[in-house]
Amino acid sequence: MDFKQIKSNVEKVKFLRKDFPILNKKFDNKYIIYFDNAATSQKPKNVIYSNVEYYENYNANVHRSGHKFAIQSSIKIEKTRELVKNFINAESAKNIIFTSGTTDGINTIASSFFYSKYFKKKDEIILTTLEHNSNLLPWVNLANLANLKIKLAKFNEMGIITPEEIEKLITEKTKLISISGINNTLGTINDLESIGKIAKKYNICLFVDAAQMAPHIKIDVKKIGCDFLVFSGHKMLAPTGIGILYISNNMAEKLHSSKLGGNTVEEIFIENEKIKFKASDSPNKFESGTPNIAGIIGLEEAIKYIDNISMDFILEHDKQLIEYGVKKLQELDEVEFILNTNLKRNSIISFTVKNIHSHDIETYLDTMGIATRAGRTCSYVAFFPENLNKDHLLRISFYFYNTQEEIDNFILGLKKVIKELS
């Protein structure tokens, strides 16, 4: 049976779940309820088998040797690059850089800014109070090294960074805005297209952390108008250790790579008794050494899988799960939502339970085969007293293979935890 021939969304999800081995195995006599998809997604068979096929049948390094295995591997790499280009509607495959993940992509550009001497002293970078540490610390480090100023845009009562909040922070010294499309703590969605127009208006670089966005919402870098965009494969069905960095043509020409080695130069020569080199064009100049070939091949299969079921289906299913999950949690008097219940969420619900620490809930739920996330979700600034004013929370995050039945079982488990630990 073909997925597209199935009419009912419930039946579609049942059909898709068969593709995920980990969802069809019992652990301690229980099937896992996996509600930690914001951390990483599970992997379908086609992704898993693509890696086995590569290592068994054409394992070789890429863009170097001329034998058939190397040629086949290189073709697969460039095929995936083209697929990613279409996935985010980039201008060219040359704008697509393979990284080890979102964090690596952000650090790559932060260090490239430094090596390229892009900023002047006292220039400003705008971040937000809802950023993951990975979209905070590289910029803080850059600011410390280059004597820059960091400004933080605050979220409103709906957990959103408004374009107006961004614009009021802009001065003639503002050179970069870095913001997440969907934040990993609340799951709220920022208006990137409006923020992109503001960045263009003031001739400011726009950097987008799309780690939570890429698995759930169609990305169009042309509509956003961003100069950079990063995401990780492992949150959208692909293996760990593979990510994407999109760089606009303009910025690819301006920046020097901070990571040099094989594949990054066209020529090395001696001039005035000094060794010099001519850097390769993008993407090569940003991809030093041997890439994660198996990861890239797995990413190709992951994108094919998502394209087949469509982002429209994923978005609609996310919406149904969020609405149902919020409704069921509202029935529990002990549950306190972060900010409020009416947030425009994508795939994440965060809350606390009165008088019970979230880590205790997480641990107890794990004994029932329910995977969640507790703590500060690697977004420490968000938890400051002037922001969320929380020490911890419990986060549940969905993907298209999750079901309302799983939410029902989660609620039963949570009720048991509350009864036992209150």
Curated annotation (Swiss-Prot):
Which chemical reaction does it catalyze? (sulfur carrier)-H + L-cysteine = (sulfur carrier)-SH + L-alanine
Q: What InterPro entries is this protein classified in?
A: Aminotrans_V_dom, Aminotrans_V_PyrdxlP_BS, Cys_dSase_SufS, Cysteine_dSase, PyrdxlP-dep_Trfase, PyrdxlP-dep_Trfase_major, PyrdxlP-dep_Trfase_small
Its GO biological process annotations read: cysteine metabolic process
Q: Could you name the domain of life of the organism this protein comes from?
A: Bacteria
One GO cellular component assignment for this chain's record is: cytosol
The UniProt record lists the EC number as: 2.8.1.7
MF (Gene Ontology):
cysteine desulfurase activity; pyridoxal phosphate binding
**Which UniProt keywords are present, listed alphabetically?**
Pyridoxal phosphate, Transferase
Q: Which Gene3D superfamilies match?
A: Aspartate Aminotransferase, domain 1 (3.90.1150.10), Type I PLP-dependent aspartate aminotransferase-like (Major domain) (3.40.640.10)
Q: Which residues carry this modification: N6-(pyridoxal phosphate)lysine?
A: K235
* Co-factor requirement: pyridoxal 5'-phosphate
Similarity comment: Belongs to the class-V pyridoxal-phosphate-dependent aminotransferase family. Csd subfamily.
Q: Give the function comment from the record.
A: Catalyzes the removal of elemental sulfur and selenium atoms from L-cysteine, L-cystine, L-selenocysteine, and L-selenocystine to produce L-alanine.
Protein name in UniProt: Probable cysteine desulfurase
Q: What organism is recorded for this protein?
A: Borreliella burgdorferi (strain ATCC 35210 / DSM 4680 / CIP 102532 / B31) (Borrelia burgdorferi)
